[in-house]
Amino acid sequence: GCDGLVLQPYWGPGLKKPNARGAIIGFSDCHTLYHLYRAIIEGIAYALRDGLEGIERRQHAKVKEIAVSGGGSQSDAICQITADIFGVPVFRVQTYETASLGCAIVGYKYLGVYNSYEDAVKNMVRRSKTFNPNMENHEKYDYLFKKVYLKMFGRLSDMYVDLKKFSKKYSD
């Protein structure tokens, strides 16, 4: 991992925590730009895991594997980090442009080529590579996720409010 560097990627719109800001904790003199880049990747994966675990709790179901697509999915390193953080196999589909694939699936279902979306997916989606979790790495990530990442927002939330007030008062 990042030698104890943990990032909380609260910098985008749509958060249910409007005062939240991105945060990085754990810096020391051993950290390099590599650690920072990796912390960004890991932080995004932690945020996705947090969201998935919320869905699993509400649905009373456990995800057994994860399909990935998009630009980041083209990196073997990112896919492996994702598998290690989630603790389940991650597979890359045959194209990273899955929006087009999804449209084709809907179209073929609508035209009656396939009777169900499940049939269309089964026939049109191909796995190109699977990344199995390294459970030793998962244990480390799980510790950081539960003991650090999940606690960051609660511990920093008062400071986020102060930062928001500061920005309103002193921003140009």
Predicted regions located by residue number:
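Glycine/Thr-rich phosphate-binding loops that ligate phosphate moieties of nucleotide
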Residues: 1-172
